[in-house]
C-alpha cells in the first residue's frame, strides 16, 4: 500500500531529482530486486516507493 499523507508531506515523486534518488538514500528500504518497489523509513506503511523516486527527506547513503 501507499501512505499518501506522508508522501505529500515530503513531496514524494516517482522520478529522480538532480541525480538524487531513493536507491541512493539512507532512508530507503530496498525491495526484492534493485528495480522493485521498496519501503522508506520516513514514510511508514508504504511499500510502493520507487528506487528511482525522490522526496524532501533524501539523505545520501554513506
UniProtKB/Swiss-Prot annotation:
Coiled coil start-end: none
Domain of life: Bacteria
Binding annotation for [4Fe-4S] cluster: 22, 25, 40, 55
GO biological process assignments: aerobic electron transport chain
InterPro entries to which the protein is assigned, alphabetical: High_potential_FeS_prot, HIPIP_sf
Claim: Hydrolase is one of the keywords in the record: no
A GO term, aspect molecular function: 4 iron, 4 sulfur cluster binding
Bridged cysteine pairs (disulfide): none
Pfam families: HIPIP (PF01355)
Keyword Iron: yes
Keywords: 4Fe-4S, Electron transport, Iron, Iron-sulfur, Metal-binding, Transport
PROSITE patterns xrefs: HIPIP
Function: Specific class of high-redox-potential 4Fe-4S ferredoxins. Functions in anaerobic electron transport in most purple and in some other photosynthetic bacteria and in at least one genus (Paracoccus) of halophilic, denitrifying bacteria.
SUBUNIT field: Homodimer.
Family: Belongs to the high-potential iron-sulfur protein (HiPIP) family.
The protein, known as: High-potential iron-sulfur protein
Source organism of the structure: Rhodocyclus tenuis (Rhodospirillum tenue)
Chain's gene name: hip
Amino acid at each position: 500500500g501507499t501512505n499518501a499523507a506522508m508522501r505529500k508531506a515530503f513531496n514524494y515523486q516517482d522520478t529522480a531529482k538532480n541525480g538524487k534518488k531513493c536507491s541512493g538514500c539512507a532512508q530507503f528500504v530496498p525491495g526484492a530486486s534493485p528495480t522493485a518497489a521498496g519501503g522508506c523509513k520516513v514514510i511508514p506503511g508504504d511499500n510502493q516507493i520507487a528506487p528511482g523516486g525522490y522526496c524532501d527527506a533524501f539523505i545520501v547513503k554513506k
